[in-house]
Amino acid sequence: MAQREWVEKDFYQELGVSSDASPEEIKRAYRKLARDLHPDANPGNPAAGERFKAVSEAHNVLSDPAKRKEYDETRRLFAGGGFGGRRFDSGFGGGFGGFGVGGDGAEFNLNDLFDAASRTGGTTIGDLFGGLFGRGGSARPSRPRRGNDLETETELDFVEAAKGVAMPLRLTSPAPCTNCHGSGARPGTSPKVCPTCNGSGVINRNQGAFGFSEPCTDCRGSGSIIEHPCEECKGTGVTTRTRTINVRIPPGVEDGQRIRLAGQGEAGLRGAPSGDLYVTVHVRPDKIFGRDGDDLTVTVPVSFTELALGSTLSVPTLDGTVGVRVPKGTADGRILRVRGRGVPKRSGGSGDLLVTVKVAVPPNLAGAAQEALEAYAAAERSSGFNPRAGWAGNR
């Protein structure tokens, strides 16, 4: 979204939060509204679609610290009549007539103000006024307006997140018009260079001792004119539609991680570059596996004899099973490490598999098993083994 539109919109009100809301409050408000207003949940309701777009625009600005700071500064600058309504008082008596076109007293439009800033490459008000008062009076061609960034969410199984997965992602957003391929012109025609400004998008004017540039009124600052607009997009080059894109989720993605898909965001007007799409990944917990960074964790139930006498366990991994040797006399709760069988790393290779052994006590014993265990207990006592020897809880 261009800066010029920020003056006219209250993004905080759009999301229903205060101007000092925390990032988490903004995120929660956006998620709730996006869920309620999503076109898939409101088929045949264009009003909900427009509201969904407005909420997405507000979140796009307020969720980015740099954009939010710039937005707040812009609102403060123009709040309370600082530049007053639709007319700009030059402070030079009536000499400028409100910066009118040709000195006829026409009102100054704030949209023109920001268009001028965009064309001169400036991002500050100081740069803007420097251009208006003749500091660097050459007009530059207007830059195409990049589309907004978009955000969406998806949910993955634990194994899908660990190994990576290719998946279709369905979203509803402004996209290049399929009828005119984003040009805005009716198929078979093309935009023409504006003859008034020769494609620069601005007109240079001199008024007394001052020179300044203003947007070309014929092409509205775009530098081109569409004589025959596309019937589908009405000349914007953009239509809101539902599309499906194939997304490759890289191996090792973590819960809450954002993935950037360049150029998959909202389409720019008249063939301008598209914004980016940010996908927040949510990972469902797994019944078997856990994760510690790039290490894969698993807890395996074992018997007392497997720990006391030693054994080999068949342990699940992301790719089949692996045999893990349990040394004789292994303690309950010990972690056994299997190198290279964990979660794939972005830099190559994989983390380790961490196997925790946990004794499973039989709830009931009878017959030969009970007799054998009782005989073992007697032999253990006679050997002098005391599991609580040296325990701090002894009194």
From Swiss-Prot:
GO terms for molecular function: ATP binding; heat shock protein binding; unfolded protein binding; zinc ion binding. InterPro entries: DnaJ, DnaJ_C, DnaJ_domain, DnaJ_domain_CS, HSP40/DnaJ_pept-bd, HSP_DnaJ_Cys-rich_dom, HSP_DnaJ_Cys-rich_dom_sf, J_dom_sf. It is found in: Cytoplasm. One of its GO terms (biological process) is chaperone cofactor-dependent protein refolding. Zn(2+) 1 binds at C177, C180, C230, C233. Binds 2 Zn(2+) ions per monomer. Pfam families: DnaJ, DnaJ_C, DnaJ_CXXCXGXG. A zinc finger (CR-type) spans 164-242. Its cofactor is Zn(2+). The keyword Ribosomal protein does not apply. CXXCXGXG motif repeats lie at residues 177-184, 194-201, 216-223, 230-237. Residues 10-75 form the J domain. The keyword Chloroplast does not apply. Zn(2+) 2 binds at C194, C197, C216, C219. NCBIfam families: DnaJ_bact (TIGR02349), PRK10767.1 (NF008035), PRK14279.1 (NF010872). Participates actively in the response to hyperosmotic and heat shock by preventing the aggregation of stress-denatured proteins and by disaggregating proteins, also in an autonomous, DnaK-independent fashion. Unfolded proteins bind initially to DnaJ; upon interaction with the DnaJ-bound protein, DnaK hydrolyzes its bound ATP, resulting in the formation of a stable complex. GrpE releases ADP from DnaK; ATP binding to DnaK triggers the release of the substrate protein, thus completing the reaction cycle. Homodimer. Belongs to the DnaJ family. The J domain is necessary and sufficient to stimulate DnaK ATPase activity. Zinc center 1 plays an important role in the autonomous, DnaK-independent chaperone activity of DnaJ. Zinc center 2 is essential for interaction with DnaK and for DnaJ activity. Was identified as a high-confidence drug target. This is Chaperone protein DnaJ 1.
